[in-house]
């Protein structure tokens, strides 16, 4: 199957290009039209011979304007109050309606998936409760990570992202801090799988977060 890459910003699309030979790549950062031109994007990839697409990297939602027929279809399906997840679901539905399959980054490069088990050191507690909190937060479509500080304090990720959450934890003088990050239960992991990497680890170390727990197989480990 000929797979094309729709590349947003960040490390993930760069890593994928290093690991996977894509039939065609479209860099959304240099795409000359607004991202509302969904039909044009789809036609470009199909004309290049792509039978499936991998969507990877961050995209500025503010560029979703000047809708063409495909963009209008996506906007109407998602609804006027749609969050990022609903918009992505509608985008996937459009591509699939046009006969283009969607492949996740973790599918085209399975080694990126966070493996089960303890990667370094030793784990002396059951991480289930922290992961449950992270999933509950994700179910509210707010964030994907929580940090347990000391005995009773929990910090929750918001729209500012995981690194901002970690910085907030650095302001808490607790001896023990643990980060938990999990996929949102409702999210389509083909296009929206949570990521982590050296930047996450460095930020955590600086903030005094000594233990990092990531949901196995449902998060991507970058540059590790």
Task: Label every model-predicted segment.
Residues 1-47:
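N-terminal glycine-/serine-/threonine-rich phosphate-binding loop
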Residues 29, 33-50, 67-80, 164-224:
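Feature captures the catalytic cores and cofactor-binding loops of soluble hydro-lyases/lyases
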Residues 7-12, 58-61, 219:
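Gly/Ser/Thr-rich loops at beta-strand to alpha-helix junctions
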Residues 23, 101-102, 211:
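Hydrophobic beta-strand scaffold residues
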Residues 5, 55-56, 181, 214:
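Redox-cofactor binding/interface segments in oxidoreductases and associated redox assembly factors
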Residues 38-109:
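N-terminal glycine-rich phosphate/adenylate-binding segment common to multiple enzyme folds
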Residues 13-19, 54, 203, 223-224:
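A short acidic, amphipathic alpha-helical/loop segment
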């Amino acid at each position: 199957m000929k797979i094309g890459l729709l590349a947003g910003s960040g490390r993930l699309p760069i890593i994928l290009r290093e690991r996977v030979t894509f039939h065609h790549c479209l860099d959304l950062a240099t795409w000359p039209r607004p991202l509302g031109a969904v039909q044009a994007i789809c036609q470009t990839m199909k004309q290049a011979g792509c039978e499936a697409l991998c969507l990877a990297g961050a995209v500025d939602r503010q560029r979703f304007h000047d809708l063409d027929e495909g963009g209008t279809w996506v906007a109407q399906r998602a609804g006027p109050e749609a969050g990022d997840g609903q918009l992505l679901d509608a985008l996937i539905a459009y591509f699939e309606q046009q006969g283009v399959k969607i492949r996740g980054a973790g599918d085209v490069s399975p080694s990126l998936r966070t493996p089960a088990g303890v990667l370094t050191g030793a784990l002396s507690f059951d991480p289930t409760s922290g992961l449950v909190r992270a999933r509950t937060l994700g179910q509210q479509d707010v964030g994907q990570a929580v940090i347990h500080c000391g005995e009773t304090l929990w910090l929750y990720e918001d729209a500012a992202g995981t690194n901002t959450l970690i910085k907030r934890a650095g302001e808490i003088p607790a001896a023990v801090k643990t980060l938990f990050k999990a996929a949102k239960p409702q999210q389509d992991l083909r296009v929206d799988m949570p990521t982590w990497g050296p930047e996450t680890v460095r930020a955590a170390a600086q903030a005094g977060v000594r233990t990092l727990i990531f949901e196995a197989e449902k998060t991507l480990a970058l540059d590790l």
